[in-house]
Every structure is written in C-alpha cells, then in structure tokens.
Curated annotation (Swiss-Prot):
Listed Pfam families: Exonuc_VII_S
UniProt source species: Bartonella bacilliformis (strain ATCC 35685 / KC583 / Herrer 020/F12,63)
EC code: 3.1.11.6
Annotated GO CC locations: cytosol; exodeoxyribonuclease VII complex
GO terms, biological process: DNA catabolic process
Name of the protein this chain belongs to: Exodeoxyribonuclease 7 small subunit
Subcellular location: Cytoplasm
Catalyses which reaction(s): Exonucleolytic cleavage in either 5'- to 3'- or 3'- to 5'-direction to yield nucleoside 5'-phosphates
The entry's keywords: Cytoplasm, Exonuclease, Hydrolase, Nuclease
Gene it is expressed from: xseB
Complexes and interactors: Heterooligomer composed of large and small subunits.
Family note: Belongs to the XseB family.
C-alpha cells in the first residue's frame, strides 16, 4: 500500500509524527518499487525528518539531565535535573 509523502513543514511536527512519517519512508524505500526520482525526494525528506527527531531528542535529554561540575569547574558527569 503506497502512502503519499507530503512536503509539509517538518519543524512543526511532534517527535511521534515525524517518526511515523520516517517509518513510512523507510517502508517505501525498502519495498523498492518507488521510481528513482521519487526515491531521491523521499530519501531527502527522510534525512530532514531524522535530523528533526534527533533535535527533539536532544532537547528532551537536556530537560532531564544536568551537567555536574567538579570543584575546578570541569564537567565530570550528569545527574537527573529533578532527582526525587
């Protein structure tokens, strides 16, 4: 079943929405029945979606971890932002 890959604005997508679109792209490319030009277009969109997901994951990670500094100010590890 072919699904249309829309060229909408990636930056407004949630992590889950972007991941779902990325899964559709991978499925279409793995099937191998997509014309070459379309494969290139959807591959490029897949790269943009992957980068968007990476960015969102880094933001989430920054919210839950805080860098621990040693006495001389150098980083020595991370700890939960709000330990309970």
């Amino acid at each position: 079943m072919k699904q249309e890959i829309k060229k909408d604005d990636i930056s407004g997508l949630s992590f889950e929405e972007a991941l779902k679109q990325l899964e559709v792209i991978v499925e279409n490319l793995e099937r191998g029945d997509v014309p070459l030009e379309q494969s290139i277009d959807i591959y490029e969109r897949g790269e943009a979606l992957k980068n968007h997901c990476d960015k969102l994951l880094k933001v989430a990670e920054a919210k839950i971890e805080k860098i621990q500094l040693s006495n001389n100010g150098t980083p020595e590890g991370v700890k939960p932002l709000d330990p309970e």
